[in-house]
């Protein structure tokens, strides 16, 4: 992405995927109660809170669109991740996708996916064990996720010649 700031951040996706956006909002509200905060800190926390509300509104719009198109599975996924943490692999991938793209939208294009294997594996493993997901279905979901992450990379000259901000750590 030619206009983004090179920042190479690796957000704590694991916490938000596991606990949800409402938990993040509660965390911010608790920090806002600290009487020793200065004005800059108050503005920062309020901005973070407003960003989460905006993400939730975006998810709500996608949920309504899914319902209009009779995509009930997608609508249910979106309804859940709008407030709660992910309950399965599909929801975890969807919330990660929205969080990742929301950070992009803020102009931070080098936000890596970090230790994807560590925070996604528990959802994958649990779904396999309880029979709600097959390895083939998981592969399809992962394939779609990574294709979407790089959907527009061919639009930018030289994009695949170096770090494109889509770093993934495995191991």
Which positions does each model-derived feature cover?
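Catalytic cofactor-binding cores of redox enzymes
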Residues: 1-171
